[in-house]
Amino acid sequence: MTRLVTATEMQQIDNYTIETIGMPQDVLIERAAMAVLDVIGAGRFDLSHVLVLAGLGNNGADGVAIARLLYAQGVNVSLQFVGNVSRAKDSVKRQLAIIEKHGLVRSEKSDFNEATLIIDAIFGVGLNNVLPEGLQKMIKAANHIDKPVIAVDVPTGIDATTGEVRGAALKAHTTVTFGFTKVGLTQQNGCYLSGNVILKDVGMLIPDDFEFSLQETLPVA
């Protein structure tokens, strides 16, 4: 069983696992990417053309790793960044350096109509503001086309703590969340927009004296 966590609690657990325990961040990214691939493989998804939408933070780094693993399996995958890559976190840049050696070329702009599956790796638990207007428009266009979406950790636009929509949210068919289920996936619009929530253990650790603000428990895959 695992507990529900707020965005702040999840970030504290991340920091403890990486900074105190010494688990390399790239190991967690790889495990998260492999967990998403497990879900893709277990589902009946059309992999004719997978579009990975990646942000500039750690969620985006997960997305780049997912794109790489799919590409290595021979899947037709397009990787599109949302935002200026020059401002991406180091975790994203490290993943980019790897895919460049693999030969996977980033797409400047992709047509949602051509995609048979969309991977949402734009924003995760770190979202704390209303989404930019341009991103809101893109999300609304994607929702209108109604393609199957797998969200990485949390659907973009959903507040991981409250479940509120921050301007617009990408509606997911499936959400693969890591370590602990975020409260926002069970509250308000977050419950509806997250689709089928699958919890995956990627090796995160918690301090012995860590106190959860909520007591609910859910099964872990």
UniProtKB/Swiss-Prot annotation:
GO terms for cellular component: P-body. (6S)-NADPHX binds at residues 58-62, 124-130, 153. Binds 1 potassium ion per subunit. Belongs to the NnrE/AIBP family. Residues 10-210 form the YjeF N-terminal domain. PANTHER family: ENHANCER OF MRNA-DECAPPING PROTEIN 3 (PTHR13612:SF0). K(+) binds at residues 59, 120, 156. It catalyses: (6R)-NADHX = (6S)-NADHX; (6R)-NADPHX = (6S)-NADPHX. Gene3D superfamilies: YjeF N-terminal domain (3.40.50.10260). Its EC number is 5.1.99.6. Catalyzes the epimerization of the S- and R-forms of NAD(P)HX, a damaged form of NAD(P)H that is a result of enzymatic or heat-dependent hydration. This is a prerequisite for the S-specific NAD(P)H-hydrate dehydratase to allow the repair of both epimers of NAD(P)HX. Transmembrane segments: none annotated. It comes from Leuconostoc mesenteroides subsp. mesenteroides (strain ATCC 8293 / DSM 20343 / BCRC 11652 / CCM 1803 / JCM 6124 / NCDO 523 / NBRC 100496 / NCIMB 8023 / NCTC 12954 / NRRL B-1118 / 37Y). Its cofactor is K(+). The gene is nnrE. One of its GO terms (biological process) is deadenylation-independent decapping of nuclear-transcribed mRNA. Keywords: Isomerase, Metal-binding, NAD, NADP, Nucleotide-binding, Potassium. GO terms for molecular function: metal ion binding; mRNA binding; NAD(P)HX epimerase activity; nucleotide binding. It comes from the Bacteria. It is an enzyme of class 5 (isomerase). InterPro entries: YjeF_N_dom, YjeF_N_dom_sf. This is NAD(P)H-hydrate epimerase.
